[in-house]
Every structure is written in structure tokens, then in C-alpha cells.
Design a protein with these regions (language model features):
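Active-site loop-to-helix "anion-binding N-cap" substructures in soluble metabolic enzymes
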Residues: 1-168, 172-260
């Protein structure tokens, strides 16, 4: 199948109580039980990441655990931050880095994002790097935008280290909107990301999975992933219903298996 397709979800801070977070994690685990053709992950609200980790570990499941953020250092005086040491201890696997909301509201710059990526790789976890553009533009301009972001965020990291990197393409203008970006636009954007990445890290770019995030729903998932450069989807609020998340997984699987 080549690059293994991905479906993941970030709960941001929508599910912050232990009971609801655990129930959701158990529900999607049960609904996707036995799924081996896709890689699945959940990024729970940070305050409930421990009980969610316990819930996932206490049952047969294929849902990987990740964190929505980490501190740029593993240990030290950073009040209120979340250490990657905790995620490792929880047997987490993914680290979301560079989301639009972190870049915008918390003023995280490329240097800080680069530090977090390097720390994630040092701990043998998977960085999920989020990138996007502020407004719709042409393919050539998109490539220029993406190459600038990637060059800064991936600075001083060898291509060999980046084989496990996941890129989540989330156009800023589509986050939280009623509808996702058009599938044709997403296809061009993903192609430009891979081309920009290839110019920076060479053949390793072929191993990097690029998924789309931004108002993904069960109605749009199929058309969005119907392109060889779109390796999956990063779901938000339209996956808060476990049945909807499971349906998105089913749709992505059908499309990607048919394509191979």
C-alpha cells in the first residue's frame, strides 16, 4: 500500500471531564476494533490525557495516543507546560506541533517549533507538524509559502530523521469553518508540500505522510483523500460523535484501498 493511511482526531479542549473523555476514547476504540489497514490516533484534551491513556491501554484497541503540545525542553522550570517525559511514560506516540492556534494565540515561532520537533525525534516519537496558508492562492505561490515554513521548522534535522514525520496541512482559512477546502485545491496543496519537501530533504519526502485537516466530515473525507498525495485526514469537531469518526475511518479506508 506504500504510505499507510492515517486518520486522527484532536479534541482540543472540548472534552475536559474524565468521564466524557474516557467514554469517547472507549467508543471509538470499540467502533474501530481490528482495523489494521489504517493508522489511527487521538489527541485528547491535555487535562484528561492520563485517564484516556489508561482507557486505551486497558482494552484491545488500535488507537494511538498523542499530545496536542509539549514544552521545548524535557525537564526544567517552565511553569504550566507539558513535558514529553510524561507522554513517553504514558506510552504516547504522536506530538502535534505548530498548529495555527499555537502559532497565533501563543505566538509560537519557527525556532520554537523546530526545538519541539527535534525533542520529539530525540525521544523517538512522531512529530505531527501542522502547516497552512492564510488565504487561498495558486500552486506556485503555495509551494513558495510551504517551502519557507518547512525550511525553518525542519532546520538542522537530517533527512533520515524525518522519515517518520507527519505533516498536517490545515489551511488557516478552513479551520473551524462550515466546509472543508475543495478537494481539488487540497490535492494541489499536498502536491506542492511534497515537492517543497523533496527539494529540502530529497527522497525521504516520499516516506512522509501528509494528511488534510480543516472541517473534515464524513461527507467530505472521501473526495479529500482521493489523491495519492493525501495520506489521510486530521479530524476536528465533525468527529466528536464516535459514530461519525468511525464512518470517516471507513470511508478513508475504502478510498485508499481501492486506489492501491
Amino acid at each position: 500500500m506504500g504510505r499507510k493511511p492515517l486518520v486522527g482526531i484532536s479534541l482540543k479542549i472540548y472534552q475536559n471531564k474524565i468521564a466524557e473523555a474516557v467514554n469517547y476514547a472507549q467508543s471509538i476504540s470499540q467502533l474501530t476494533n481490528g482495523e489494521n489497514d489504517l493508522e489511527l490516533f487521538i489527541l485528547p484534551s491535555m487535562g484528561v490525557i492520563y485517564p484516556v491513556a489508561q482507557a486505551l491501554h486497558n482494552r484491545e484497541n488500535v488507537i494511538g495516543l498523542g499530545a496536542q503540545n509539549i514544552a521545548p525542553i524535557a525537564n526544567g522550570a517552565l511553569t504550566g507546560e507539558f513535558s514529553i517525559e510524561s507522554l513517553v511514560d504514558l506510552q504516547g506516540h504522536y506530538v502535534e506541533i505548530g498548529h495555527y492556534e499555537r502559532r497565533t494565540y501563543f505566538h509560537e515561532d519557527d525556532e520554537l517549533i523546530n526545538q519541539k520537533i527535534q525533542l520529539t525525534l530525540k525521544n523517538q516519537l512522531v512529530p505531527l507538524l501542522c502547516i497552512g496558508e492564510a488565504q487561498q492562492t495558486t500552486g506556485a505561490e503555495l509551494k513558495t509559502v510551504f517551502k519557507k515554513i518547512l525550511a525553518a521548522d525542519l532546520a538542522n534535522i537530517s533527512p533520515a530523521q524525518l522519515a517518520t514525520l507527519i505533516i498536517a496541512y490545515e489551511p488557516y482559512w478552513a479551520i473551524g469553518k462550515a466546509a472543508a477546502a475543495q478537494a481539488s485545491y487540497v490535492a494541489v496543496a499536498h502536491t506542492m508540500i511534497r515537492e517543497a519537501l523533496a527539494e529540502l530533504i530529497g527522497p525521504t519526502a516520499d516516506n512522509v505522510r501528509i494528511i488534510y485537516g480543516g472541517s473534515v466530515s464524513k461527507d467530505t473525507a472521501g473526495s479529500l483523500v482521493n489523491n495519492p498525495n493525501v495520506d489521510g485526514v486530521f479530524v476536528g469537531r465533525f468527529g466528536h460523535d464516535p459514530q461519525n469518526f468511525a464512518e470517516i475511518v471507513k470511508i478513508v479506508k475504502q478510498v485508499k484501498l481501492q486506489a492501491n
